[in-house]
Amino acid sequence: MDTNSNSPNETGILFVGHGSRLPYNKEVVQAIADKYSETKPDYNIEVGFMELAEPNIPTAFNKLAATGVKRIIVTPVFLAHGLHTKRDIPTILGLEPSPDVEQYVQGHGHHHHGHHHGHHHGHHHHHDEETEKIEFDGEIIYTEPIGADDAIVKIIAERVNPHL
């Protein structure tokens, strides 16, 4: 039996998108996950959304957990860090939110009932569907967002340069 947590049956991957009332965000995040899945066809890969689209993060996460994986890699499909990637997503996952965001949220009006103690009570744009809790005893690896990567610069150049 393979006990390597890098093996496909031990590791799940969750792509997290923002979500939108319009279909485009969901379609793009799903397409990115599908394209990635073509490179890792043996891995269980799911997509979940912060808000305004289904499945939400707990539903997608718990679907992966139900496959018996020992660890789940959560990757936010966001260009840059923000309150969602630094506070909201970690809180939903039961991880500690990044302490550096609190200075920016004073008076923001989107606090989680004024306290943080390891579980999620809901989010300002979420409705009652966000009551599902994450149930997982394994390892959660939470990656950085996309960032100012050379691959992004190349894509922007492909869009802009023909018009120069």
Located regions from the model:
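Active-site-proximal alpha-helix that buttresses catalytic centers in soluble enzyme cores
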Residues: M1-L164
